[in-house]
Curated annotation (Swiss-Prot):
It comes from Cutibacterium acnes (strain DSM 16379 / KPA171202). InterPro entries: NusB-like_sf, NusB_fam, NusB_RsmB_TIM44. GO terms for cellular component: cytosol. It holds the Pfam family NusB. This is Transcription antitermination protein NusB. Residues 217-228 have a biased composition (Polar residues). Keywords: RNA-binding, Transcription, Transcription antitermination, Transcription regulation. Involved in transcription antitermination. Required for transcription of ribosomal RNA (rRNA) genes. Binds specifically to the boxA antiterminator sequence of the ribosomal RNA (rrn) operons. One of its GO terms (molecular function) is RNA binding. Residues 242-261 have a biased composition (Basic and acidic residues). Gene3D superfamilies: NusB-like. It comes from the Bacteria. The keyword Iron does not apply. The gene is nusB. Residues 168-261 are annotated as: Disordered.
């Protein structure tokens, strides 16, 4: 993978290529690119990319790689970090979020944009040192712009449960690597070796062993469809038929992304 040091709008160091797209290198410290003045726009851009990937049922990294080049509409470094981080840890994130939902509710039955915002928020809570109130505030702000009236209180409760009951965040783990997370063994035995945000393949396969003994948040705010009326064979990725509202939202997200400086 080739690297160079050509300056770009958010340049903080060497870049790397993801397909034909030149983006900032993701370091061991996910916070390297979390500049306070740009991270809100970066989260919106990450939401756009992850939403599109979920909509068409493809790998978020493929959508990231297909985005315009650096001189037309650059992918913000922190947005790339978030997309790659969520893609690397999605199995574990979904496990934690599912355990924090009340009985009978699933991620698959949540509105698509809320599901993506929940993953983004859970990733920042569990894998970065972004202050928890800031994570929830950003998720609420984006939900108010792109989702339903019920989404803000729903996400507030869900992410609050992740903070209270979810696995300890990265900085609380007994590890020298600030971006690693030690997961308990599935059989209750000794802990598995730490896994890192950089190791996309191994993290995606190992992060399904988060603790399940977490409290549930009441999600009866009307933000998700009635579980009694939902198909049991629903698949989270690629099995959800996009609605006209989904396509309108995808267009709106992308339009805002391309016009945001």
């Amino acid at each position: 993978m080739s690297t160079n040091t050509v300056p770009t709008p958010d340049d903080e160091g060497p870049t790397e290529w993801i397909g034909d797209l030149e983006v900032r290198r993701v370091s061991g410290d996910i916070q390297e690119h979390a500049d306070l003045s740009t991270r809100s726009k970066a989260r919106k851009q990450a939401l756009d990319i992850l939403f599109e990937a979920d909509l068409i049922g493809t790998d978020p990294l493929e959508v990231l790689a297909a985005r315009p080049g650096v001189f037309t509409n650059p992918v913000r470094p922190f947005a790339a970090d978030l997309v790659r981080g969520v893609a690397a840890t999605q199995v574990g994130l979904d496990s934690v979020l599912t355990d924090c939902l009340s009985e009978g509710w699933t991620l698959a039955r949540m509105p698509r944009v809320d599901r993506i915002l929940a993953r983004l928020g859970a990733f920042e809570i569990l894998h970065t040192d972004t202050p928890n109130p800031a994570v929830i505030s950003e998720a609420i702000e984006l939900s108010e712009e792109f989702s339903t009236d019920d989404s803000a209180p729903f996400l507030n409760g869900l992410l609050g449960a992740v903070i209270t009951h979810g696995p300890a965040r990265v900085e609380d783990q007994p590890s020298d690597d600030a971006a690693s997370l030690t997961c308990p063994a599935p059989d209750g035995g000794s802990e598995q070796p730490p896994i890192t945000v950089d190791d996309v393949g191994s993290m995606a396969s190992s992060s399904d062993s988060f603790p399940a003994e977490v409290g549930n948040v009441d999600t009866t705010s009307g933000n998700a469809s009635d579980p009694e009326n939902s198909a049991d064979d629903f698949e989270l990725t690629g099995g959800e038929h996009p609605t006209s509202k989904d396509h309108e939202l995808a267009t709106d997200l992308h339009k805002k992304d391309t016009t945001d400086d």
